[in-house]
Amino acid sequence: MELDEIKVFGRWSTKDVVVKDPGLRNYINLTPIYVPHTAGRYTKRQFEKAKMNIVERLVNKVMRREENTGKKLKALKIVENAFEIIEKRTKQNPIQVLVDAIENAGPREDTTRISYGGIVYLQSVDCSSLRRIDVALRNIALGAYMAAHKSKKPIEEALAEEIIAAARGDMQKSYAVRKKEETERVAQSAR
């Protein structure tokens, strides 16, 4: 007897998802999982979160805002409904669209503050792959909440639109891509 393939939310396969960016390949975890909920198993050590499924990391970022703090089931439903909308609009695997959005929304360069002789100035530094993913997921979730705040648009639709726009690299529609470009522009001026 052959076992069925394990799919995220019982619908979407991670088997055909391709990570194009070689720097992010080791840090975007696409292991098949029914429900992306590991109950903090990978938070004990420094780089353990690279072992966490990328969908669960998105769910955890969605869960951070005021009204959703600690409500993981609500965040899981938001992400699942957003994935349904993405699948209807793009006719693609929503996990592949999410991976493309992370690749386009993660900044490659950032700045750090350096104090030298009492004078503080910014110095351009390269971003690590793990930080690129963290910043991209945070900005995608933040952009969705900003689009849904004080509007009739539900959060699921706002999250789906943000992920689709970030996957296309659309600066006009995606908050995450705009923030990435702004961060890289500031870093370039601080070289």
From Swiss-Prot:
InterPro entries: Ribosomal_uS7 (IPR000235), Ribosomal_uS7_arc (IPR026018), Ribosomal_uS7_CS (IPR020606), Ribosomal_uS7_dom (IPR023798), Ribosomal_uS7_dom_sf (IPR036823), Ribosomal_uS7_euk/arc (IPR005716). Keywords: Ribonucleoprotein, Ribosomal protein, RNA-binding, rRNA-binding. GO terms for molecular function: mRNA binding; rRNA binding; structural constituent of ribosome. It comes from the Archaea. GO terms for cellular component: cytosolic small ribosomal subunit; ribosome. Signal peptide: none annotated. GO terms for biological process: ribosomal small subunit assembly; translation. Part of the 30S ribosomal subunit. One of the primary rRNA binding proteins, it binds directly to 16S rRNA where it nucleates assembly of the head domain of the 30S subunit. Is located at the subunit interface close to the decoding center. HAMAP family: Ribosomal_uS7_A. Belongs to the universal ribosomal protein uS7 family. This is Small ribosomal subunit protein uS7. It comes from Methanocaldococcus jannaschii (strain ATCC 43067 / DSM 2661 / JAL-1 / JCM 10045 / NBRC 100440) (Methanococcus jannaschii). The gene is rps7.
